[in-house]
Amino acid sequence: RCRTRAKTPRNLALADSLVDKATEIIKYFKSKNPDLIWFIENGDSTMLWGREVAKDLSNYVRLDYCQYNGPGYRKRTRIAHSDNIIWNPRPLCDPKTCKQCVDGKHILTAQQGPGKRNGTRTASSLDTCTLDTLHGLPRELTEEILRICQQHIWEVL
């Protein structure tokens, strides 16, 4: 995929090595605790999910941050998880009914600079997100993940 505004080239070797290390850590701790619960999050439309390094990340859910009262943008993401949990996330966003949309458009775009509206770049400083905002999980999503983990613990006991 072409990144027309990218300032640096993709480093797929580095990205793959990070995923390899994460799966290595998961396998190590799973050998110590076969009931281990784990999660790996990455954007839904990223190249990761089609790469060889992600072939074992086959249990996943797709969700939109806006459905968890996130900061105002959609950000569709994919969260791979261990096969010992059942997770039915909230439905994907429908801009016609989404509480974070005005006239069918999300109030923010998931990027650091101003976004586009109707094909033209906006100059609004209100449509600018900090890196911390973009990297954070919505509180309600974090709470849902915690409930899944707590429920699993009680099932095991």
Language-model regions, residue ranges each:
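Conserved active-site and SAM-binding loop architecture
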Residues: 1-157
